[in-house]
Amino acid sequence: MRHTILLSIVVIAAFTGCGGQTTRTTTPPKAKTMNCTLDICGDKKIQNPTESDIRQAVFALDTKKVDAFLILGPTDMTYIQTGGDQNVGFKLEYQETDTKHHYRANRDLTADEIVKALVAYSTGADESKTMAEWDLVRW
């Protein structure tokens, strides 16, 4: 009888945590980092750019001096790209796998918005796609 009671207590404790309240929390998953290359005006490429690299590249763009564009992506057919500068604003486009899936933001964005979009894209976050409404580009 004593063994049965002891076994019952052990079983109850195992399932209820000895009567103490337990709180379960889940850690949000870390954003996955894509293997991306940042192409700066066709002159310089940075493999897996940091947020600092992206910010510096965006704020350095100047349409009066050179072709001012950035392309960030894992392949030649999957990428996000921008053109412009702080004075004229920035266009933003992205493409997924082929030219049938090429989209352009329907408004100009600020330099800070471009940094946010490119950083989000580089980590695999969908935030870059929710910053604007997108129009399908028909070639």
Stretch-by-stretch model annotation:
Residues 1-4:
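Positively charged n-region of N-terminal signal peptides that target proteins for export
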Residues 6-12:
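Hydrophobic helical h-region of N-terminal Sec-dependent signal peptides
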Residues 14-17:
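C-terminal motif of bacterial Sec signal peptides marking the signal peptidase cleavage site
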Residues 19-21:
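Bacterial signal peptide processing site
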Residues 27-73:
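Negatively charged, low-complexity tracts enriched in Asp/Glu with abundant Ser/Thr
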Residues 63-77, 126-139:
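Short glycine-rich, low-complexity/disordered patches
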